Swiss-Prot record:
<dbReference type="GO" id="GO:0016020">
    <property type="term" value="C:membrane"/>
</dbReference>
<keyword id="KW-1133">Transmembrane helix</keyword>
<comment type="function">
    <text>Plays a role in the regulation of membrane potential. Could mediate a proton leak.</text>
</comment>
<dbReference type="GO" id="GO:0009414">
    <property type="term" value="P:response to water deprivation"/>
</dbReference>
<feature type="transmembrane region" description="Helical">
    <location>
        <begin position="34"/>
        <end position="54"/>
    </location>
</feature>
<protein>
    <recommendedName>
        <fullName>Hydrophobic protein LTI6A</fullName>
    </recommendedName>
</protein>
<dbReference type="Pfam" id="PF01679">
    <property type="entry name" value="Pmp3"/>
</dbReference>
<dbReference type="InterPro" id="IPR000612">
    <property type="entry name" value="PMP3"/>
</dbReference>
<feature type="transmembrane region" description="Helical">
    <location>
        <begin position="11"/>
        <end position="31"/>
    </location>
</feature>
<keyword id="KW-0812">Transmembrane</keyword>
<dbReference type="GO" id="GO:0009737">
    <property type="term" value="P:response to abscisic acid"/>
</dbReference>
<comment type="similarity">
    <text>Belongs to the UPF0057 (PMP3) family.</text>
</comment>
<dbReference type="GO" id="GO:0009651">
    <property type="term" value="P:response to salt stress"/>
</dbReference>
<keyword id="KW-0472">Membrane</keyword>
<dbReference type="GO" id="GO:0009409">
    <property type="term" value="P:response to cold"/>
</dbReference>
Length: 56
């Protein structure tokens, strides 16, 4: 139950601010930097990537 709750919160954060959700899940790794770059190019690609990375 707690793991699914954490994933749900991470997904909500990923929708509001994609790099923040990825940062809380993976720290300052390559996933964060890719998400940050995609968010700068467009908000929607950042959201899609963040949700995909968090749920995989």
């Amino acid at each position: 139950m707690a793991d699914s709750t954490a994933t749900c919160i991470d997904i909500i954060l990923a929708i509001i601010l994609p790099p923040l959700g990825v940062f809380f899940k993976f720290g300052c790794g390559i996933e964060f930097w890719i998400c940050l770059l995609l968010t700068f190019f467009g908000y929607l690609p950042g959201i899609i990537y963040a949700v995909w990375v968090i749920t995989k």
